[in-house]
Amino acid sequence: MNRIFYAFIALMALASCANSYDISGTSNVSTLDGRMLYLKILENNDFKNVDSCDVVHGQFHFQGSVDSMKMANIFMDDDLVLPLVLESGSITVKLDDTQQVVSGTPMNDKLFGFFKKYQQIQNQLRELVHKHDQAIMNGSD
């Protein structure tokens, strides 16, 4: 009976680890150092705090459990820093002056792959608008 009890406890401990997230982040943005970041999810048209942490020497860390995959956002005070998919696994966040990247889990890899492709399309659109404007200025509409 004792063995069954310990086996059950061990099984429950392993099952609880399967639904945990671990977000490790780095940043070279100097204004973030010493600031508090908040991990929030949208619930009933309002953002609910899930976790918070301090940025120390450009590093921050969120950790907890999640029952299902959810869209979440990292905020600094009331300012949105970036969106991510809150799912079980190890998530890596990189914030710098030129880009924001989240990776390490399947849905975050897909989400930021989409953002990267979207940015490429936006850049192509700006280039086409610039060429169009140049053609108008040159009189070759």
Write out the residue ranges for each language-model feature.
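A non-transmembrane, solvent-exposed segment enriched in polar/low-complexity residues
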Residues: 17-141
